[in-house]
């Protein structure tokens, strides 16, 4: 399947520290050419505002919501063209866009490869950064401005999420980890990966995101899931993490599924990679996994059903049954929050 690179140089969920340069850096490192997508789609990003929104306490929520809708449009067009979207951030907040695009189509899963839980509640986030909240936000926890995009809260159900590679180093990590484990989210933390191996970790994640009642899944790769000694080019460093080989094995297995609908890569800060060596390794990781995807004309489901052009997207809530033939209009009742 042909890939389509979508550049989303957004620092709105964190800060403009250099991660917004990642798409251009990866292009210069040859990623776009290697993926066969020299003509990337680029999403415009509003100016960064370092003053918190008074209603939500979050930095740049309106800008993040606007970027999410624009990204959703680009992902939607890419899928309708039968291509595989590869999003390059930017910070973690860009995950809202592809999940909104998929949510408009139906019910999808999320394979969330991340060294952090990203499950803070906005009231507990000291800096107002959505980057610490993104998994909470996409599962419907937080202000309506971000959690109820297009009236479709949640973008993904807890039971349809697999968090892989998360590691615990301090009391806050432990608290968030315990909170996540009290939900229906599947957690495959770093300790479990090391204990059972990447094969079992992959099997557990796929069991969650390829359930028969899901129409596919999205893959979020936060590069801080990698070992800090190998990936120091991130703003919030965190000791330990996956090796390049472990990350390749897990990501390859996820993307080899014909249920995978796209990949998003976030948080790489090229200003912390002065010789460009990390950018080259990251290009290798992305190309070596994306290019192993099954051949085909488009994102066909394993049951053979996939409408090539969606004239009507589903706008039902995720706690309602999703019929095979979908249409506009039903809003239903949202899932409970914390």
What is the predicted function of each stretch?
Residues 331-336:
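Short, intrinsically disordered C-terminal tails of secreted or membrane-associated proteins
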Residues 80-149, 158:
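Active-site histidine-anchored catalytic micro-motif
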Residues 169-181:
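Short, glycine/polar-rich helix-capping loops at beta-to-alpha or helix-loop-helix junctions
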Residues 6, 90, 113-115, 164, ...:
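Active-site flanking residues adjacent to catalytic metal/cofactor-binding acidic residues
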Residues 310-311, 320-328:
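Ser/Thr/Pro/Gly-rich low-complexity, intrinsically disordered segments
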Residues 3-86, 98, 179-310, 314, ...:
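Catalytic cores of soluble, metal-dependent hydrolases
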Residues 12, 91-95, 169:
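Gly/Ser/Thr-rich loops at beta-strand to alpha-helix junctions
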Residues 112-115, 139, 160-168, 189-191, ...:
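Short, structured patches in soluble enzyme cores that scaffold and shape functional sites
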